[in-house]
């Protein structure tokens, strides 16, 4: 284990621990702590990428939990065009127990944003961006459940927006798949990527249990959202279930990232269990829920209730790459009301960017069992598996 320490007031994380590889082909696992100011951040991958990923997650969480700067207080119709204000009103009406009049007349704290398509500057409610309970405390009654879906951090604004778009597509694809139980295609669990650490993870997981890989991309969308599932009945294995998801412009890239994410979740849960921790030690409700899903039945429930829209199992990973323009055109056909929150700061003489993509016409967060706008432009109550509308997706 390698530990790196920084000063208390440093912009950089307090402690970083890099665990040794299980073998020369396995990915590195890096974790970051910061004097309990944020929840730990982690990443897996090739050595440098795991370090970069963990640091990026640290900066992202630090910003969205602690550093959201709000503007003045305005009503929805004062801060944005009427069509967007109406969409947010309907979303908050579903989420809260308040009337439309109460939502329309309420003055929300604001943050700056721009429309994803027109690039027009506007403001949006800070409560859908800030993850703490202080920044927009008076607005929490309209939007109590929040998460990091759609968030991104990068040294380039374009790359940060691209990261947010991928996060956004992952969330929408995952929730629609969970609620409807439909996947586009299945990818062979015996797939070979030609990338050492990816193939090594798949080999290790296959030797211990079962793997299923599904393309769950939103219907008609360019690119690929790949969900990788792992489950085992092995009684001596601490980890019975794990999963990873990634959206990318090529199938191979999405698959590889989803496998790494599955492995990251696997290692995090394994470290937690061997450390002797319990549910009482977990603050994050998503992580607490994911820990409760650590059973083989979570794997079988997903696999047995997945309807494939195509019976063909993919045996190879073609390299068809879609452009961001195609994705933007696809999203705009569904809704014009997609917005990008953005902020920047200087870290060690470099400019870095934070972004988050949100839309009242899509799922606003990932907890479908909580206070959410479940009726939107891509899903309506009763369109899928009814029992799942009140049961959170088994995902970290």
From Swiss-Prot:
Q: Where is the YcaO domain?
A: 41-396
Cellular component aspect of the GO annotation = cytoplasm
- Superkingdom of the organism of origin: Bacteria
Q: Does the keyword Cytoplasm apply?
A: yes
The record's section on PROSITE patterns has:
YCAO (PS51664)
Output the InterPro entries linked to this UniProt entry. Answer: YcaO-like_dom
Where does the signal sequence lie? none
**Keyword set includes Cytoplasm:** yes
Enumerate the UniProt keywords alphabetically. Antibiotic biosynthesis, Cytoplasm, Plasmid
> Known Pfam families for this protein?
YcaO (PF02624)
Biological process (GO), any one? antibiotic biosynthetic process
Location of the protein in the cell: Cytoplasm
Function, please?
Answer: Necessary to process the inactive microcin B17 (McbA) precursor into the active peptide.
**What is the name of the protein in this document?**
Microcin B17-processing protein McbD
Organism (species): Escherichia coli
* Taxon lineage: Bacteria, Pseudomonadati, Pseudomonadota, Gammaproteobacteria, Enterobacterales
Q: Which gene encodes it?
A: mcbD
